[in-house]
Amino acid sequence: AIITGSLVMGNMQFADALRHAAFQVGSIITTTGYATINFDAWSQTCRTILVLLMFVGACAGSTGGGMKVSRFIVMVKTMTKELNSYIHPKSVKKIKMDGKPIEHEVVRSINVYLITFMIIFVASVFAISFEGHDLVTNFTAVAATINNIGPGLSMVGPDCNFGFFSNFSKLVIIFDMLAGRLELFPLLILFHPAVWKELFTQKI
């Protein structure tokens, strides 16, 4: 609704604004990767909303990328629970999803995933920043790849591509794409020495 209103205020017809806004929001939040218009030319408000939606991702259990909606819900509920515990120290409340309590181990694993995601994200943005491109390009390039979105903003917008990056930056982006598609930990496990040691031991 906000994007539609912003586009209408930018002299776009309501029907076209609603169609483009609905399609781009749906495409980004489901990590489809399509673009029917150069949304990089939209207002700062629209672009900010689209960037935020890049991190939400698809539903739990789907093949879409991103952090997944369920993880965000658990994260918000965890923050609310911690805030309430400061206000009411003696209260005992459990985090619930669909009316069922979530085990502490599940909450811990989600928190670890989100922390790992942010570490990889920040490290990737820092790694490709040495080429001297603007922050919007670097930030959305990593956001678009690690969340399997497709196009980003600025130099990696819908009308552009990632071909101008150096080979090193492309390797970083490739890693982010694999991490976003395969999930973080299955990919990181491949780099653990114990996995390779066990593999070579079995061959011998």
Residue spans for each PLM region:
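Membrane-proximal intracellular helices of multi-pass ion channels
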Residues: 1-204
